[in-house]
């Protein structure tokens, strides 16, 4: 299932999925989505966290070893896999598909990816991730939507500003919300 970052809070309030994939064009929104997922998991007792980063030379068998290992300290844990390039390669793609077929119990899996093109999103490994859990897409905030988006963000913090200030902020952060 694919949702937007705006829909994530509603999805997390219902029930935690065993797998979340966070990807997209807007780094701030991907960071915030991953933080929300981790916070919701901690609230449900998922205390321990293991992070794997798939860089060149990554041993893909470590993904399944981590998934199948038991924690000495906590019964519930978060297993996070970061694929900074968004390209797991042939071996990685096969490992991801196998991983999706046997998701570990008492583990919330969080996969962090950058922006993916249409070919990557239609790949076997990504469609397996999407079918096994919830894919959260962080789309870039369009220029015409940015003033409203900034206003909503300010309102969430119980702040407000006039239209001229909002326009000034929009001009300064366009293309770089971080």
Task: For every predicted segment, state its role.
Residues 1-178:
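Conserved beta/loop motifs at nucleotide-recognition and modification sites
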């Amino acid at each position: 299932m694919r949702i937007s970052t705006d829909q994530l809070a509603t999805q997390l309030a219902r029930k935690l999925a065993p797998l979340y994939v966070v990807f997209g064009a807007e780094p701030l929104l991907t960071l915030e989505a991953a933080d929300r997922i981790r916070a919701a998991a901690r609230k449900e007792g998922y205390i321990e966290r293991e992070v794997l980063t798939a860089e060149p030379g990554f041993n893909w068998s470590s993904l399944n070893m981590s998934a199948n290992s038991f924690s000495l300290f906590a019964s519930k844990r978060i297993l996070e896999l970061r694929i900074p390039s968004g390209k797991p390669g042939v071996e990685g793609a096969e490992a991801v598909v196998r991983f999706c077929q046997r998701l570990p119990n008492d583990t919330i899996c969080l996969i962090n990816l950058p922006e993916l093109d249409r070919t990557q999103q239609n790949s076997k490994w990504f469609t397996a991730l999407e079918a096994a859990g919830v894919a959260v897409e962080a789309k870039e905030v369009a220029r015409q939507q940015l003033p409203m988006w900034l206003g909503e963000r300010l309102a969430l913090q119980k702040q407000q500003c006039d239209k001229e200030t909002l326009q000034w902020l929009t001009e300064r952060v366009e293309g770089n919300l971080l």
